[in-house]
């Protein structure tokens, strides 16, 4: 009966965090609008081989993540939940692997359930796992690879070992097809310390080639198909998206070596108090095969991405699955022997909640700031933000009431965040970061436009997805579409600032021309170097400028 209650509680937890509130949040640009539009175009065109964005070739990522996103929009429609359905599904599948792997390692159902809840409630997992990017997919394939390798090495018969390595190769292959060759580097680096400490080199060399074969066979059909359709895809994807992005001096998203330290700290909320003890206990028990394996899958990817020049918080998402297992194991030991870490965790959550309440007041219309984040007419959003932090502090306090029994309620600290964050975003943020908000405000003007031009790829993708059209023209800036715009058949999809006046004269009689520009909050739009317009509609950071036929 207790198991049934636990399952009901888990499903309610998942519904409140990962299902019910998702549609209340508008899509963020540039990431969510980009992936939403790529998948919409894939469904509309029926081309499941070559990814396109705004009708242009888009070679920044392989195809598998777009497949999953497209299935999400096909099943649930072109809406906020449909766009995020794929990442939510991948996150929940990863949580299922956490459950299964924890149960296999320790044979403890309670521990397995706790590891799952800890994983799903980690701030970084929740933030990325409900945000339409490709990282939850690659995290799933990496965690699946972690489980597959363990299965292979624990099998006694050659059939079990062979099956495990074949499965490992498939997961690596799908990882390559999701985000590239990092899906090969991370598993290799993660298993090497465990193989070395356990002296299992023989099994690795005997059966490892099976993983290589299954990986190649997984990637080969699509790899050959896109090479035939677009011969330069692999050159661009390997050199630009891997070497330049991560290793060269001009790498994208450059950051210092210690970049991930604050990411780990913030990402571990509301379980931050368990982080030091989980890592220390894992190291202290490194003679235990399972513990050192989880520790290796936590630390090695973190070191790898720290050494790389290009860094983003999403890159280390896969580290938090083994870390959640270590945290759950340590938490049960602490509850049984010395609950000091659990008390510290409760106080950290109280401090975080109280700090958030104070910070919300400071940036509110009633605070000391001359330019508050929220305006007076957005008072309800301020109260939503206060509710988020109040609930965080409340559940932090509740875990201290009987810490040996109530410590696990820290999983409810982000409940307010899950339910209310979509209602607390300031209008000034929505106007710049949520193209849907802009489209809703300017729908009547945008809909009849013959041509739409914009200077932001993220805004362009948002306009295309909302208006269900992929012919948005880039104005003045090419951004990440630079490579796709170099193709001969992309002529006419970019208009420079110097050419705009002539282009306008040539096309004005064909219908309404709409220019959507991103501007600074205090920028005078009358000073823009553009021909006089027939209509201007400013929505803070985005401006709609229209030219009608003469």
From Swiss-Prot:
HAMAP family: ArnT_transfer
Protein name as it appears in the record: Undecaprenyl phosphate-alpha-4-amino-4-deoxy-L-arabinose arabinosyl transferase
Gene Ontology molecular-function annotations: 4-amino-4-deoxy-L-arabinose transferase activity; mannosyltransferase activity
Ranges that cross the membrane: 7-27, 81-101, 111-133, 137-154, 165-185, 204-224, 255-275, 288-308, 315-335, 346-366, 382-402, 406-426
First-tier enzyme category under EC: transferase
Protein family per UniProt: Belongs to the glycosyltransferase 83 family.
Gene Ontology CC, one term: plasma membrane
Pathway where this protein functions: Lipopolysaccharide metabolism; 4-amino-4-deoxy-beta-L-arabinose-lipid A biosynthesis
Places the protein is found: Cell inner membrane
């Amino acid at each position: 009966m207790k198991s049934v209650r636990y399952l009901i509680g888990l499903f309610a937890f998942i519904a409140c965090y990962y299902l019910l509130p998702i549609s209340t949040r508008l899509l963020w640009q540039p990431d969510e609008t980009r992936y939403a539009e790529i998948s919409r175009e894939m469904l509309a065109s029926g081309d499941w081989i070559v990814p396109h964005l705004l009708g242009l070739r888009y070679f920044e990522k392989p195809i598998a993540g777009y497949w999953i996103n497209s299935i999400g929009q096909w099943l649930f429609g072109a809406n906020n939940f449909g766009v995020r359905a794929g990442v939510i599904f991948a996150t929940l599948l990863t949580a299922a692997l956490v459950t299964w792997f924890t149960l296999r390692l320790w044979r403890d159902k309670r521990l397995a359930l706790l590891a799952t809840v800890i994983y799903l409630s980690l701030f970084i997992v929740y933030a990325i796992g409900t945000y339409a990017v490709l990282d939850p997919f690659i995290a799933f394939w990496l965690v699946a690879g972690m489980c597959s390798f363990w299965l292979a090495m624990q099998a006694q018969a050659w059939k079990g070992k062979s099956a495990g390595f074949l499965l490992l190769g498939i997961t690596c292959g799908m990882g390559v097809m999701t985000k590239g060759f990092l899906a090969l580097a991370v598993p290799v680096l993660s298993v090497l310390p465990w193989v070395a400490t356990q002296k299992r080199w023989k099994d690795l060399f005997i059966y490892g080639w099976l993983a290589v074969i299954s990986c190649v066979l997984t990637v080969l059909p699509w790899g050959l198909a896109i090479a035939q359709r677009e011969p330069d895809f692999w050159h661009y994807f390997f050199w630009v998206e891997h070497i330049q992005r991560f290793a060269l001096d001009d790498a994208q998203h450059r950051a210092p070596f210690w970049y991930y330290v604050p990411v780990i700290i913030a990402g571990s909320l509301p379980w931050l108090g368990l982080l030091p003890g989980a890592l220390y206990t894992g190291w202290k028990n490194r003679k235990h095969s399972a513990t050192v394996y989880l520790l290796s899958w936590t630390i090695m990817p973190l070191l790898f991405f720290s050494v790389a020049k290009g860094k983003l918080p999403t890159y280390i998402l896969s580290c938090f699955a083994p870390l959640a297992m270590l945290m759950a194991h340590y938490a049960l030991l602490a509850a049984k022997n010395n609950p000091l870490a659990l008390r510290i965790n409760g106080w950290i959550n109280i401090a975080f909640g109280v700090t958030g309440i104070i910070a919300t007041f400071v940036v509110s219309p009633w605070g000391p700031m001359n330019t508050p984040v929220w305006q007076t007419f957005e008072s309800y959003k301020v109260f939503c933000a206060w509710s988020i932090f109040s609930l965080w502090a409340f559940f932090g306090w509740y875990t201290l009431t009987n810490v040996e029994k109530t410590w696990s309620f820290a999983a409810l600290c982000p409940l307010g965040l899950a339910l209310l964050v979509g209602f607390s975003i300031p209008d000034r943020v929505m106007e710049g970061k949520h193209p849907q908000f802009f489209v809703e405000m300017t729908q009547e003007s945008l809909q009849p436009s013959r041509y739409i031009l914009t200077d932001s790829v993220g805004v362009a993708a948002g306009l295309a997805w909302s208006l269900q059209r992929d012919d948005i023209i880039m104005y003045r800036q090419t951004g990440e579409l630079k490579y796709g715009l170099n193709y001969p058949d992309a002529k006419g999809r970019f208009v420079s600032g110097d050419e705009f006046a002539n282009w306008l004269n040539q096309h004005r009689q064909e219908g309404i021309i709409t220019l959507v520009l991103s501007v600074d909050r205090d920028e005078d739009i009358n000073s823009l170097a553009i021909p006089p317009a027939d209509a201007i509609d400013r929505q803070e950071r985005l401006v709609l400028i229209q030219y009608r036929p003469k």
